[in-house]
Amino acid sequence: MVLSLCVMAPNRIVWNSEVREIILSTNSGQIGILPNHAPLLAALDMGVLKIRSDKQWSAMALMGGFAMIDNNRVIILVNEAERASEIDPEEARKSFQTAQAELAEAEGRRKLIEANLTFKRAKARLEASTIV
């Protein structure tokens, strides 16, 4: 049994093929999806989507969105997505360190929220780049 996975961003279809298993980062934590999963609609957090095709794992950084699972079909609508192969690990590491420093120094509610979003984005990109 397989899952039909389609990941769509506003400007492109990022992934559209059959997979064996996926692991999603939702607002309430990570969930694994296997064939014959119960129907589900989930809000996605900024994080990593892990995809298993046969014995190979792939990853992509997702920048929030929604996932709909029904009848072995998974449709993921995201604000932005980057495949791990599109991310430079060294650049992702530098961005993460910069975001971490900015978060530690952020003062005021607005600056803290902005720094936290930048940090979560950088963390997702770094995690995705190291899974390959």
UniProtKB/Swiss-Prot annotation:
Subcellular location as annotated: Plastid, Chloroplast thylakoid membrane
Membrane-protein topology: Peripheral membrane protein
NCBIfam families the UniProt entry points to: ATP_synt_epsi
SUPFAM superfamilies documented for this protein: Epsilon subunit of F1F0-ATP synthase N-terminal domain (SSF51344)
Protein name (record): ATP synthase epsilon chain, chloroplastic
InterPro entries: ATP_synth_F1_dsu/esu (IPR001469), ATP_synth_F1_dsu/esu_N (IPR020546), ATP_synth_F1_esu_C (IPR020547), ATPsynth_dsu/esu_N (IPR036771)
GO CC annotations on file: chloroplast thylakoid membrane; proton-transporting ATP synthase complex
Organism encoding this protein: Adiantum capillus-veneris
Main location: plastid
Entry superkingdom: Eukaryota
Database matches in CDD domains: F1-ATPase_delta
Family under the similarity heading: Belongs to the ATPase epsilon chain family.
Pfam families recorded: ATP-synt_DE, ATP-synt_DE_N
GO molecular function: ATP binding; proton-transporting ATP synthase activity, rotational mechanism
UniProt function note: Produces ATP from ADP in the presence of a proton gradient across the membrane.
Record carries keyword Ion transport: yes
Keywords assigned: ATP synthesis, CF(1), Chloroplast, Hydrogen ion transport, Ion transport, Membrane, Plastid, Thylakoid, Transport
Subunit (UniProt): F-type ATPases have 2 components, CF(1) - the catalytic core - and CF(0) - the membrane proton channel. CF(1) has five subunits: alpha(3), beta(3), gamma(1), delta(1), epsilon(1). CF(0) has three main subunits: a, b and c.
Gene3D superfamilies reported in the protein's UniProt record: 6.10.140.480, F0F1 ATP synthase delta/epsilon subunit, N-terminal
